[in-house]
Amino acid sequence: FTVNIGLIEHGVPVLGVIYAPPQNLLYYGAKKLGAWREKEKGKPEAIHARIPAADGLVVVRSRSHPSKIAEAFLNTLTIKENIPSSSSMKLCLLAEGTADI
């Protein structure tokens, strides 16, 4: 599970925070500050999405809510690895460059 906090100013998102207590991982990003990850007792690390590898995509999938539509779409792609994940962690894995889609 995760705790998610966002700040919107005048209809524009300016800050986002995702904390995963079981892993003690904190992800955050802010306008003009970039995106960051902090592991337990670690210093902040800048994170960024990646360019997919030519040999296939790394896919994060819902652990508890499979979708026939998503499966049909994914079947059209070359997939190198599947990572089951839950809640907002899927978005964090994309943001840190662990997964492609």
Feature-to-residue mapping (PLM):
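N-terminal glycine/serine-rich phosphate-binding loop of ATP-dependent small-molecule kinases
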Residues: 1
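Acidic beta-strand-loop-alpha-helix segment within the catalytic core
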Residues: 4-92
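Alpha-to-beta junction loops
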Residues: 96-101
